[in-house]
Amino acid sequence: MLLSVSCGRQHQAKGVIQDFIDQYAAEPSACSSISIVKFDSTQTVNDSIIGRMRANADTIQRYKKSIKYADGAISKKLFIARITYTVNDAEYSDTYYLDDQISRVVAFKTN
């Protein structure tokens, strides 16, 4: 039972991340083969770290500038999804931080 819950959460996370990439990637149609390679949770990421990741996101050329993150308080517990994907045949890896409901991207960083 635990495995199916975990797989369900991972599948939900992949959908949220795919929607985020579709909206904010510089070339969303060039992104393909998105895979979650690690999925976990954390309670150690604070508002300051999230703020730095969000500010850094504007410098990543694979993404549009001025990303609009969902409104609302950021939960103490976050889910972490490390993904791999390709853009124009080049492989990349990013880490996404999702809220405790796995309904929105809170922040992300490149690896």
Regions found by a protein language model. Give the residues of each.
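Sec-dependent bacterial lipoprotein signal peptides
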Residues: 1-7
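Cystatin/cathelin-like cysteine-protease inhibitor module
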Residues: 7-111
